[in-house]
Amino acid sequence: SLLVTSGPPDSSLQVWQVSAEDSDVIKSVSAISTENGTGQPWAKIAATSSRAPWVLHGSRLNNVQITEVESKKNVYVSGSRSSEELSAVAFLDCNTLLVCCSKGQLCLADTRQPQGPLEAAPGPAGGQRWCMGVGHGPPNSQPVARLSSGGQLALTDLRKVSEPVACARCSVSSPGSSAEFLAVSWAPALEGCIAVSGFDGTVHVYETRSWDGSGREAEPLFVHKGHAFGGLDAGEGPPVVTAHTWHLQKPRTLLSAASDGSLHIWDWVPPRGS
């Protein structure tokens, strides 16, 4: 198996080989160059193997590309002239990609147009930074959730990306904090459930099916506080959750990591009567 990562030591993507089951060795095998200039954010990445091992990557709208991992050949290059910074990229299927700008705009593109347009639809107002999570579903009807650094959540129907179908506000302790680790994700096996992290040392689980367009504060079904009780970073205050993901086979199991190096695997229980 191959893994692709983005990050140090430079702007390139690193390709890793995962050894067979009887070994725990992961070795670097190659690198994929990107168009990220010095000082630009690391590329956001997403992968698909539905047609061939492809990686979607880019840090701004005008440098979004799809590269075939083994040959390193570009099969799609954005035709956008905009330098809007990206916060997330995703494959909806082998022919459709979705990107989210840090200001909250969503952009759809057809990978069958090698230099197709990738223009941002109007985004939310305000100076907040946003991230995106794409749920599971039939092509072009997957639910999309966006989370802002101010704690706002917007749910979007991809058939009309310019307007959210529902919105709410997270009950987080420190909205407006750094957006570096913001994350929102859909449960793969629980309809309407999302998880939110990146504000502090907690992960919140929400049920979204009752949300409307009012934007009122939503109460979480469950809050995982395990990281918040970990050791303090040296002179940097309490740990912050840096990433989380849902277990694919266990509906109520999540994995989360924090800035103190802790990694938790945990289950959540819905409130009684829910």
Model regions: which residues?
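WD40 beta-propeller repeat fold
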Residues: S1-T156, A166-A189, A195-G215, E219-S274
